[in-house]
Amino acid sequence: MKTKREDVRNIAIIAHVDHGKTTLVDELLKQSGVFRENQEVAERVMDSNDIERERGITILSKNTAVHYKGTKINIIDTPGHADFGGEVERVLKMVNGVILVVDAFEGAMPQTKFVLRKALELSLPVIVCINKIDRPEARPDDVIDEVLELFIDLGASDDQLECPFVYASAKAGVACLDLSDPQQDMKPLFETILEYIPAPEGDPEAPTQVLISTIDYNEYVGRIGIGKVDNGTISVNQDMILVNHHDPDKQQKVKISKLYEFDGLSKTEVKSATIGSIVAISGISDISIGDTLCSPEKAEAIPFQKISEPTIAMQFIVNDSPFAGQEGKYVTSRHLRDRLFKELNTDVSLRVEEMENTDSFKVSGRGELHLSVLIENMRREGYEFAVSKAEVLYHTDENGKKLEPIETAYIDVPDEFTGVVIEKLGQRKGELRNMGVSNGGYTRLEFSIPSRGLIGYRGEFMTDTKGNGIINTSFDGYEPYKGDIQYRKQGSLIAFETGESVTYGLYSAQERGTLFIGPGEKVYSGMVIGQNGKTDDIELNVCKTKHLTNTRSSSADEALRLTPPKILSLEQALGFIDTDELLEVTPKTLRIRKKILDSRMRKRSMMK
């Protein structure tokens, strides 16, 4: 018989990037007594990955739990970016309600639509938390209207439209139900969760069923499956059957060696858990997302959201440049292979294939951001390698027609830059679907655009909008191929010889275009040192020094004025490289180079 478990609430937090979701979770942790009074706490404790902290994005969903008035509240932090959308869909299967965090100034952002639509489709109740009410330009009343409009657009039910609104400043650690109420702590939010989010339901006497929704990995215990107990009770040393919804033939006898529940930011070992509990299970080496752990007497899989397929791919190659092995700790193909396959333990939207050439691997992911985060992580861990230009993964329909991935791009841009954005996206086969007035002199644009049209566009977009534009994308599906796109119109400036760049050589070179390097930097023949102002590639000698005579002295060099070089970020460099180029990635440096370094061989290959 189904019963409710009143001492547990399972909630997910949904928010746009940088709307204060992780800060809000930190505050709930602090006020529920997870941290000691004198304990030093890192800001945004839920973003455990360095890149997540720096970029203010959440990549992997994380679990935590707080206790309030004898009720355990399991909180799952969801990714706010569509590249990691595969995570979101699975997380929502574990919860009974969501908190939507919205910035009191920026309002409901397009990126939130993707996750919110999924939550509403699953008929989950929503608590709307209007955050950052202490911002001077906050406009909470307008934002409430925007949120309700968004709910209607997404087909919310009448019950969902009756959702409670909580005003908060996560940074100050306060919340209230009415702006005229005194603001003291987060108690109003805690109370709303207990009152509005339903308790999990299930049959504690039925055969056990636990759906694995996310995977964690630990060097000591290996793969850890995380999921909610839907029915029955799960215990340590229990014999179970592992079944997969998409592959019913996959049935395997397993034994539960260790069982954990979440408490604060850590996992606590438990002997058993029953309905509504979110548990972590170790000891099953090939447990995967979408698997159901069942009692042997009823091996029945729980229906599950299929994992989103990758849309773009890059080649990861062992670095073979003249400077190979000088800056990295892990440089061989074995190192690269082990690290990429290790990533598959936790990232289920990723694919890694070995190529015929043992030194290269084809890595496919959900988008440019997805793969750039992997590259940045590997770089920080001491890996040295090279990557090729991102390419989209095409499909074919039953008639053999070529299909390509299409995305919706949601853009907020100052009015004066609208023209240039529409023009640039038009060149990249983007179709303007919607255009409307946003707040504060901004225009909101909505484009349907091929995934390949977005490769390398973000950096260009930021330049065109002087850093004031916001672009978000979500995957739509596959459509017939839209035709060729002309990408980079400018060629590259290529170093002619190996050595150290000098002011005299760079001074001559800067007249040809934009430089990526300054004086005193090591360069090698075939390395790209800048962008040509024209369409062709030019080879330049940036290591040449002026011949000294009685009438010319080296001190005259000091009078040469160099324009500061354009230092490319990882995303900009990935967007810049062409099909005949590679990006050399080391822990210290990013270098763009030609695939064929030798000038004569390069020209010969172009003639073929």
Positions of PLM-derived features:
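Canonical P-loop GTPase G-domain recognition
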Residues: 125, 135-195
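Conserved nucleotide-binding/hydrolysis modules and their immediate coupling elements
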Residues: 209-314, 324-326, 422, 490, ...
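Long insertion/accessory domains within large nucleic-acid-processing enzymes
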Residues: 262, 267-270, 403, 449, ...
